[in-house]
Every structure is written in structure tokens, then in C-alpha cells.
Design a protein with these regions (language model features):
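Primarily the HKD phosphodiesterase
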Residues: 1-45
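Hydrophobic pocket-lining residues within nucleotide cofactor-binding pockets
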Residues: 4, 77, 142
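HKD (HxKxxxxD) catalytic microenvironment of the phospholipase D
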Residues: 48-120
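Single conserved hydrophobic/aromatic residue that forms the stacking wall/gate
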Residues: 137-140, 144-147
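Short proline/glycine- and acidic-rich turn/helix-capping motifs at secondary-structure junctions
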Residues: 120-126
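Short proline/glycine-enriched turn/loop segments at secondary-structure junctions
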Residues: 77-78, 130-132
Length: 147
């Protein structure tokens, strides 16, 4: 997505991290969440992809064991969008569409040309893909499913 600034959503993401949920977020622009902070957000990573185009997909992939729920939507998680606008989010149930979205997320996560990773102080450093842990993705993440 483009931005994550809504304090209520951020608090819920922190709570999920504290409960042990692994979370990967791909946020193009403003992100008010701080990843990798001890006892707060140790299970969260934030990747920013800055390319030639102002592209930012709003794909939400939730996974628990082998159960995946995938959604696409129109809103960035900003207070003005969630509280004062009409936005839409819809589930993706078609397996072929899910597969295509998974491939897209893999492409984003593996990108090491346009990607930056947010450090726990809010600064960014150039991202180098590693086979470790888009959008919210609970454990295991798309990286865990690579072969």
C-alpha cells in the first residue's frame, strides 16, 4: 500500500507481532509503524519500493497454517481514508487469481533494486533479498514458501 498511518490499525499490528505473528508490510510511502523494536514489533518488517512509477498495490494476504485469505482494496490505512471516505475491500477466492497475486507479492519481496527496508528508528537502508521471512502476511510468509 502507499501509506500506513492510522494509529488504531498500527496498534493492532503491534499486538499481533507481540502475539508472535510474523508480518511483512510493503509500504511505498509514509509508515508510522516502527518495525523490529524489542517487545513491540520484533516480528514486523517494512519494505518500501520506490521505482519509476507511483505503483502501490493494496493486497492483503493473511495466512494461518495452510489457510490463506486474500483481499484487494482501495484504501491505504490512513485515518482520513478509513474514517471519512468510502473505500472497498473484497476477498479473492479464485485460486488462479490468488496464485497471480502470490507471484506479484513474491516479485515485490525479492526485489533488491528498488527496495528499501525500514530500520527500527524509522530510517531506511538499501534492501538486499535473503531467503528469510506483503500487506500483512502472517507466518509463514511468502518467503517461507519459496522453493
Amino acid at each position: 500500500m502507499s501509506s500506513l498511518v492510522d494509529p488504531e490499525i498500527i496498534e493492532l499490528i503491534y499486538l499481533a507481532s507481540q502475539a508472535g505473528v510474523k508480518i511483512s508490510l510493503i509500504i511505498r510511502g509514509v509508515c508510522c509503524l516502527y518495525p523490529q523494536k524489542k517487545n513491540l514489533s520484533e516480528n514486523i518488517e517494512v519494505i518500501s519500493i520506490i521505482g519509476h512509477f507511483l505503483e502501490h498495490s493494496r493486497i492483503f494476504w493473511f495466512r494461518n497454517d495452510n489457510n490463506s485469505e486474500v483481499f484487494i482494496g482501495s484504501a491505504d490505512w490512513m485515518k482520513r481514508n478509513l474514517d471519512r471516505r468510502i473505500e472497498a475491500v473484497t476477498p479473492i477466492e479464485d485460486l488462479e487469481l490468488k496464485s497471480q497475486l502470490f507471484t506479484l507479492l513474491q516479485t515485490y519481496i525479492k526485489d533488491d533494486y528498488f527496495s528499501w527496508i525500514m530500520k527500527n528508528d524509522g530510517s531506511y537502508e538499501k534492501y538486499r533479498f535473503k531467503s528469510a521471512t506483503c500487506l500483512l502476511y502472517t507466518s509463514p510468509s511468502p518467503r517461507d514458501e519459496q522453493s
